[in-house]
Regions:
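Short alpha-helical segments that sit at the start of domains
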Residues: 1-24
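Short amphipathic alpha-helical elements of helix-turn-helix/winged-helix folds
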Residues: 8, 25-30, 42
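Basic amphipathic alpha-helical segments that dock to polyanions
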Residues: 56-66
Length: 141
């Protein structure tokens, strides 16, 4: 995954620096969406020195703009994008009980949302679709 992220970033004219690689690795180590603060703590721990939160925020903003990570808006958290070389809109299933977040790729559903917005005279720049409920495991309990 890191190689695809590096290729996507470099294809956009940006450099894959050691700090950017560390931020990506830290974010990839989380099983659930991680906040910028959590990523900062993980990078600081891995490097054995305090990394400035502002640096991590800037890198996460760059990664979001370049499709390397996606942001779960309601959680103000980030996930590594498994397909950084292919831009697509995401649908997130967010469990209100345990916090797990599943990423779905359903271009037809998102295109339908875009079409409905266009019919209403609205130009969508970046759709953010999140469905909140309970995951399969939490439903079983």
């Amino acid at each position: 995954m890191a190689l695809a992220a590096q290729q996507a970033l470099e294809a956009s004219g940006e450099q894959w620096t050691p700090l950017r690689a560390s931020v990506f690795a830290a974010l990839a180590s989380f099983e659930a969406p991680a906040s910028a603060y959590e990523v900062t703590e993980a990078v600081s721990s891995a490097q054995g020195r305090r990394v400035l939160a502002n640096s991590v925020y800037r890198i996460l903003d760059l990664f979001t703009a370049k499709n390397i990570v996606t942001r779960v808006e309601s959680q103000n958290a980030f996930l590594v994008n498994a397909h950084p070389l292919h831009r697509h809109d995401c649908i997130f299933l967010v469990c209100e009980n345990c916090g797990t977040t599943q990423h779905l790729d359903d271009d037809a559903a998102v295109e339908h949302v875009r079409a409905v917005a266009k019919t209403a005279g609205f130009a969508v720049d970046r759709p953010v679709i999140e469905l909140h409920g309970r995951c399969h495991d939490c439903q079983a309990h």
